Curated annotation (Swiss-Prot):
GO terms for biological process: translation. One of its GO terms (cellular component) is ribosome. HAMAP family: Ribosomal_bL31_2. InterPro entries: Ribosomal_bL28/bL31-like_sf, Ribosomal_bL31, Ribosomal_bL31_B, Ribosomal_bL31_sf. This is Large ribosomal subunit protein bL31B. It comes from Cupriavidus metallidurans (strain ATCC 43123 / DSM 2839 / NBRC 102507 / CH34) (Ralstonia metallidurans). The gene is rpmE2. It holds the Pfam family Ribosomal_L31. Belongs to the bacterial ribosomal protein bL31 family. Type B subfamily. It comes from the Bacteria. GO terms for molecular function: structural constituent of ribosome. Keywords: Ribonucleoprotein, Ribosomal protein. PANTHER family: 50S RIBOSOMAL PROTEIN L31, CHLOROPLASTIC (PTHR33280), LARGE RIBOSOMAL SUBUNIT PROTEIN BL31C (PTHR33280:SF1). Part of the 50S ribosomal subunit.
Amino acid sequence: MKEGIHPNYREVLFHDVSNDFKFVTRSTIQTKDTIEHEGKTYPLAKIEVSSESHPFYTGTQKIMDTAGRVEKFRQKFGSKLGAAKK
């Protein structure tokens, strides 16, 4: 194997910000933030959805539109979709 071409594979703490769930797994993600968890310092990756908050895994319906994507879609295509149904 060549030296210096492979990404750094290390333990990273992922933080699901929607429900404050944290878990440690190995990843090559590049982050600037760090956090202390159970006496160790880990690189921190903030995520919006994990298995603890996704409706498929939790069995609950929840609107997860944090960026306003649905409203943008309705503004852009709302009148066109209504005319196409007639």
